[in-house]
Amino acid sequence: MKPALTYYALLVLLLASCFSCKTDSEKKKFVIGVSQCTLEGSWRKSMLLDMKVQASEYPGVSLLVEDAADSSLLQVEQIRSLIKRKVDLLIISANESEPVTPIAIEAYRAGIPTILVDRKISSDEYTTCLLYTS
């Protein structure tokens, strides 16, 4: 597994483990919203597969994946929809930084931990950012 993909898989595993210690009566589904700029290309397909595999290890975790198909306008609308669905965590791989910045800030200010992958936004209002450098 490539180093960047290992980080993503570990991230999903770590977040899932945070919510696996509750009793049955306390458990609720932990929903991870994933906003991908595109699902084309082997790297992005591998990343998504790794996320799905890791999430499947935890019955209390589900992934909601959105493919923006290289459209920043579509990505903004999809992220807005994920916010309205009250995801517990939002992972964003922005198509372009500038158009996605306001909606990413909105998610962060709504109390949704917001993780940026592969591309930063034009703000420091996010939880963490994972950038791969060779």
Question: Language-model features: where?
Answer:
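C-terminal motif of bacterial Sec signal peptides marking the signal peptidase cleavage site
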Residues: 17-20
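Bacterial Sec signal peptide processing site at the extreme N-terminus
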Residues: 22-31
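Conserved small/polar residues in nucleotide/adenosyl-binding loops
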Residues: 132-133
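Bacterial N-terminal signal peptides that target proteins for export
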Residues: 1-8
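Extracytoplasmic "Venus flytrap"
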Residues: 33-54, 58, 63-81, 85, ...
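A short acidic, helix-capping loop that chelates divalent metal ions and anchors anionic groups
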Residues: 123-127
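Periplasmic-binding protein-like
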Residues: 87-94, 115-117
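Catalytic-core regions built around general acid/base machinery
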Residues: 98-111
